[in-house]
């Protein structure tokens, strides 16, 4: 197992997939203050994510390095993924959820296609039992799974269902996939009363290359599990960001 082999001594000027989950705060700040710089920053981050972190085949880098000073785009790297050119499954799921949330704020129609492409990549790389491995380099074998990536992606698909017209073919795909993945998580990853557990779902992988939180419970896994359930049983559930 290895981390990135690229230079890591720049100390700054990186972006990463995880930051998509902070975008809503910038849009909210723009709405509350009336200061367009927050909205502009959010839109710029979305554009940068699309241009630099999403590859041509709709897979994703975890991080992307820019040249300090000039901010010239340099190369994609990883920290929690298997290798620089692989796709870390939870990082990719941040895109499955983050892009439709951004769409609800800025109404940019190109985000629908972007979201569809990254979501289909996620779905097309799931193993038969629908619980993703920690990195999409793996589709079988004994490598750890990451149930948190599954429930985050479910949240993203159900978010997109809210704004897609009934005529959009991906709407049915999202509904069906979300139901099947959520059922798989309940069957294979959730704990029952009386079991000795530290959370609601197991088989979360925090950072495999660093040996952190392997096949464990995690607060973010539990949170998005509950959110996924709420979204599924109550389609009118409203986000609070």
Language model regions located:
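Glycan-recognition and catalytic cores of secretory/periplasmic carbohydrate-active enzymes
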Residues: 1-241
């Amino acid at each position: 197992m290895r981390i990135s082999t690229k230079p890591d001594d720049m100390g700054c000027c990186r972006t990463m997939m995880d930051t998509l989950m902070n975008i809503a705060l910038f849009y909210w700040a723009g709405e509350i203050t009336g200061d367009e710089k927050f909205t502009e920053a959010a839109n710029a981050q979305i554009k940068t994510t699309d241009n630099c972190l999403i590859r041509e085949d709709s897979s994703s880098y975890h991080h992307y390095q820019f040249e300090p000073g000039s901010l010239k785009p340099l190369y994609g790297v990883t920290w929690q993924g298997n290798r620089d050119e692989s796709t870390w499954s939870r990082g990719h799921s941040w895109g499955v959820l983050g892009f439709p949330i951004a769409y609800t704020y800025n109404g940019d129609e190109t985000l629908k296609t972007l979201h569809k492409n990254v979501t289909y990549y996620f779905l097309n790389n799931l193993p038969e039992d629908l619980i993703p491995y920690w990195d999409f380099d793996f589709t079988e074998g004994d490598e750890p799974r990451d149930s948190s990536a599954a429930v985050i992606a479910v949240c993203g698909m159900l978010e997109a269902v809210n704004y897609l017209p009934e005529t959009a073919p991906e709407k049915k795909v999202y509904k069906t996939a979300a139901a099947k993945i959520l059922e798989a998580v309940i069957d294979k990853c959730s704990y029952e009363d009386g079991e000795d557990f530290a959370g609601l779902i197991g088989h979360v992988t925090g950072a495999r290359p660093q040996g952190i939180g392997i096949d464990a419970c995690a607060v973010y896994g539990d949170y998005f599990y509950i959110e996924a359930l709420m979204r599924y049983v109550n389609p009118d559930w409203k986000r609070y960001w």
